[in-house]
Amino acid sequence: MAPNGTASSFCLDSTACKITITVVLAVLILITVAGNVVVCLAVGLNRRLRNLTNCFIVSLAITDLLLGLLVLPFSAIYQLSCKWSFGKVFCNIYTSLDVMLCTASILNLFMISLDRYCAVMDPLRYPVLVTPVRVAISLVLIWVISITLSFLSIHLGWNSRNETSKGNHTTSKCKVQVNEVYGLVDGLVTFYLPLLIMCITYYRIFKVARDQAKRINHISSWKAATIREHKATVTLAAVMGAFIICWFPYFTAFVYRGLRGDDAINEVLEAIVLWLGYANSALNPILYAALNRDFRTGYQQLFCCRLANRNSHKTSLRSNASQLSRTQSREPRQQEEKPLKLQVWSGTEVTAPQGATDR
């Protein structure tokens, strides 16, 4: 999800420091991959999570998952080895994937904020405004725009500082070049403008939600639904807040590097703000679990279903064996007096009184 930049490699002289950084980066990658896999599986298992809003959340989780699988491992290797060892061609692919995933993440968060805005500002028309077809079109546009902006700009050299150097690769470095125009345009289009719109939408959402809560506080039937809706909004706002905290320092450094030169930022500082941005991909699943009850339920179902199924199977086997033993030991007269149980489609059992079968 790193936008238009890759891991800045700085050499670590201390062995202990290098081991510590290796462990931290490995844990971050593991949490990113595992956490976003859990998000996708939870939505698949829990029907309450299968709604249009969560389509964008799943898209965001897929983006972060791809980041953890396709970008972060190579960023960590580059960070720790202090050199790029995978060649020029793969450097261009790697940086293009990095930019694409960042753009997709921002656009997903942007669409989530618009979805929440429609749900709170005009709840009666929400089913008309947000339809499955429109959501599908939005998701397709998110990925088409992301692919176009990333691969097109890098492979055509729009980010380069001179006409002769259109690549992103030197002998030992793999780093996207940033010129003045590219730094300003990309920073505004992919981060600052979406961030501004999201802040405005969430401000209006919270303002309307607060006014509605005051007006309908005495109506219990509306109160429960409103509380659930507001909790979902708070959760999504927390996700966006984490995104701002994680990525704002990097984009500030990115624009500054475009204005002042590729070497204007200290490599240590650049690496810190970059990996702070990467950490956002690991935070999103944690935020869902901490703030959203439906996601907590989905996580519980995911982690407990296999254990529950295993225990249920063992219990069923013991019950069947016990029932068979009792049946074989009963006398025929006792079997005839056994109450009749009628199984209905609703899943409940209706027990007939003894002797009902004799009538």
Swiss-Prot record:
<keyword id="KW-0325">Glycoprotein</keyword>
<feature type="transmembrane region" description="Helical; Name=3">
    <location>
        <begin position="93"/>
        <end position="114"/>
    </location>
</feature>
<dbReference type="GO" id="GO:0004969">
    <property type="term" value="F:histamine receptor activity"/>
</dbReference>
<keyword id="KW-1015">Disulfide bond</keyword>
<feature type="topological domain" description="Cytoplasmic">
    <location>
        <begin position="45"/>
        <end position="57"/>
    </location>
</feature>
<keyword id="KW-0812">Transmembrane</keyword>
<feature type="site" description="Implicated in histamine binding">
    <location>
        <position position="190"/>
    </location>
</feature>
<keyword id="KW-0675">Receptor</keyword>
<keyword id="KW-0807">Transducer</keyword>
<feature type="site" description="Essential for histamine binding">
    <location>
        <position position="98"/>
    </location>
</feature>
<feature type="transmembrane region" description="Helical; Name=6">
    <location>
        <begin position="235"/>
        <end position="258"/>
    </location>
</feature>
<keyword id="KW-0449">Lipoprotein</keyword>
<dbReference type="GO" id="GO:0007187">
    <property type="term" value="P:G protein-coupled receptor signaling pathway, coupled to cyclic nucleotide second messenger"/>
</dbReference>
<dbReference type="GO" id="GO:0045202">
    <property type="term" value="C:synapse"/>
</dbReference>
<dbReference type="Pfam" id="PF00001">
    <property type="entry name" value="7tm_1"/>
</dbReference>
<dbReference type="InterPro" id="IPR017452">
    <property type="entry name" value="GPCR_Rhodpsn_7TM"/>
</dbReference>
<feature type="transmembrane region" description="Helical; Name=2">
    <location>
        <begin position="58"/>
        <end position="81"/>
    </location>
</feature>
<feature type="disulfide bond">
    <location>
        <begin position="91"/>
        <end position="174"/>
    </location>
</feature>
<feature type="topological domain" description="Extracellular">
    <location>
        <begin position="1"/>
        <end position="22"/>
    </location>
</feature>
<dbReference type="InterPro" id="IPR000503">
    <property type="entry name" value="Histamine_H2_rcpt"/>
</dbReference>
<comment type="similarity">
    <text>Belongs to the G-protein coupled receptor 1 family.</text>
</comment>
<feature type="transmembrane region" description="Helical; Name=5">
    <location>
        <begin position="181"/>
        <end position="204"/>
    </location>
</feature>
<comment type="function">
    <text>The H2 subclass of histamine receptors mediates gastric acid secretion. Also appears to regulate gastrointestinal motility and intestinal secretion. Possible role in regulating cell growth and differentiation. The activity of this receptor is mediated by G proteins which activate adenylyl cyclase and, through a separate G protein-dependent mechanism, the phosphoinositide/protein kinase (PKC) signaling pathway.</text>
</comment>
<feature type="transmembrane region" description="Helical; Name=1">
    <location>
        <begin position="23"/>
        <end position="44"/>
    </location>
</feature>
<feature type="transmembrane region" description="Helical; Name=4">
    <location>
        <begin position="135"/>
        <end position="159"/>
    </location>
</feature>
<keyword id="KW-0297">G-protein coupled receptor</keyword>
<feature type="lipid moiety-binding region" description="S-palmitoyl cysteine">
    <location>
        <position position="305"/>
    </location>
</feature>
<feature type="glycosylation site" description="N-linked (GlcNAc...) asparagine">
    <location>
        <position position="4"/>
    </location>
</feature>
<feature type="transmembrane region" description="Helical; Name=7">
    <location>
        <begin position="268"/>
        <end position="289"/>
    </location>
</feature>
<dbReference type="GO" id="GO:0030594">
    <property type="term" value="F:neurotransmitter receptor activity"/>
</dbReference>
<dbReference type="GO" id="GO:0007268">
    <property type="term" value="P:chemical synaptic transmission"/>
</dbReference>
<keyword id="KW-0564">Palmitate</keyword>
<dbReference type="GO" id="GO:0030425">
    <property type="term" value="C:dendrite"/>
</dbReference>
<feature type="site" description="Essential for tiotidine binding and implicated in H2 selectivity">
    <location>
        <position position="186"/>
    </location>
</feature>
<keyword id="KW-1133">Transmembrane helix</keyword>
<feature type="region of interest" description="Disordered">
    <location>
        <begin position="316"/>
        <end position="340"/>
    </location>
</feature>
<dbReference type="GO" id="GO:0045907">
    <property type="term" value="P:positive regulation of vasoconstriction"/>
</dbReference>
<feature type="topological domain" description="Extracellular">
    <location>
        <begin position="82"/>
        <end position="92"/>
    </location>
</feature>
<feature type="topological domain" description="Cytoplasmic">
    <location>
        <begin position="115"/>
        <end position="134"/>
    </location>
</feature>
<keyword id="KW-1003">Cell membrane</keyword>
<feature type="compositionally biased region" description="Basic and acidic residues">
    <location>
        <begin position="328"/>
        <end position="340"/>
    </location>
</feature>
<feature type="topological domain" description="Extracellular">
    <location>
        <begin position="160"/>
        <end position="180"/>
    </location>
</feature>
